[in-house]
Amino acid sequence: MFRKQNLKWLGVLATIIMTFVQLGGALVTKTGSEDGCGSSWPLCNGALLPENLPIQTIIELSHRAVSAISLIVVLWLVITAWKNIGYIKEIKPLSIISVGFLLVQALVGAAAVIWQQNPYVLALHFGISLISFSSVFLMTLIIFSIDKKYEADILFIHKPLRILTWLMAIIVYLTIYTGALVRHTKSSLAYGAWPIPFDDIVPHNAHDWVQFSHRGMALITFIWIMITFIHAIKNYSDNRTVRYGYTASFILVILQVITGALSVITNVNLIIALFHALFITYLFGMIAYFILLMLRTTRSQK
């Protein structure tokens, strides 16, 4: 059960399931299914499987089920990795982070159901789950020895790119928080047309300010990732890890901007909204990988 040959497919399975956890959370919020099980947790409306199953209840139940399965699969992956490749420096910290943040994510979700948390607190839920996803994603990359294939294990990232990338991580995380806040405060259609309502630019209420803040952070994110991408391609053109990684990040942020704009234009089409959540999930995963590479560079300097 915990054999080394299970690591690759377990890593892929865990990454896929964690992706569905992210999408499930976005689906719950976008469809207003947060109260699909009332204030009961882990039960649903006081029962394991309630007799009355409207679509909101089905969505909330499905999200809880996928989250429970993800915890089992991630635990399986963590135990197997710890046992067989625990000698790799990053495996144990990533294992602790992935399980720890998955549990915190579940507790925040439960608290939201039972006590109806403030939306500014609920917005942290998505960011917490992204950290858990990224830890699983990184373990999977390590398991597949992606570092050796793309010479990342001998990559040295110089200080300018490290600074740009750390700032990129902070900016993206703040943008993720404002995006989650848009969902939880139901501000998706606030502040008028995209990119800005030129005939009425000044926000008028809290919903407008939340949406305005997210659009502003999204613009800063796009510009900063573009600057970082240009620097990386210009100075590391001979390294495939940097070239492919930062190119993928730039493509993902472009897709993120497009789906964000389309969400407003289409009055929050559900499919577009889910793609919006998907692209930011994998963008954050890529940034987490860059951080891993930078930490290795820092260690090599000591």
Curated annotation (Swiss-Prot):
It is found in: Cell membrane. It catalyses: Fe(II)-heme o + 2 A + H2O = Fe(II)-heme a + 2 AH2. Keywords: Cell membrane, Disulfide bond, Heme biosynthesis, Iron, Membrane, Metal-binding, Oxidoreductase, Transmembrane, Transmembrane helix. Heme o binds at H63, H125. Disulfide bonds join C37-C44. Residues 30-67, 115-125, 183-215, 266-270 are extracellular. Heme b binds at H214, H276. GO terms for cellular component: plasma membrane. Its main location: membrane. Pathway: Porphyrin-containing compound metabolism; heme A biosynthesis; heme A from heme O: step 1/1. The active site is at E60. Its EC number is 1.17.99.9. GO terms for molecular function: metal ion binding; oxidoreductase activity, acting on NAD(P)H, heme protein as acceptor. Pfam families: COX15-CtaA. Its cofactor is heme b. It is an enzyme of class 1 (oxidoreductase). One of its GO terms (biological process) is heme A biosynthetic process. Residues 1-8, 89-93, 147-161, 237-244, 292-302 are cytoplasmic. Belongs to the COX15/CtaA family. Type 1 subfamily. The N-half (TM1-TM4) and C-half (TM5-TM8) domains are connected by an intracellular loop. Each domain is formed from four-helix bundles and they align in a pseudo twofold symmetry manner. The N-half domain is the substrate-heme O binding domain and the C-half domain is the cofactor heme B binding domain. Catalyzes the conversion of heme O to heme A by two successive hydroxylations of the methyl group at C8. The first hydroxylation forms heme I, the second hydroxylation results in an unstable dihydroxymethyl group, which spontaneously dehydrates, resulting in the formyl group of heme A. Interacts with CtaB. This is Heme A synthase.
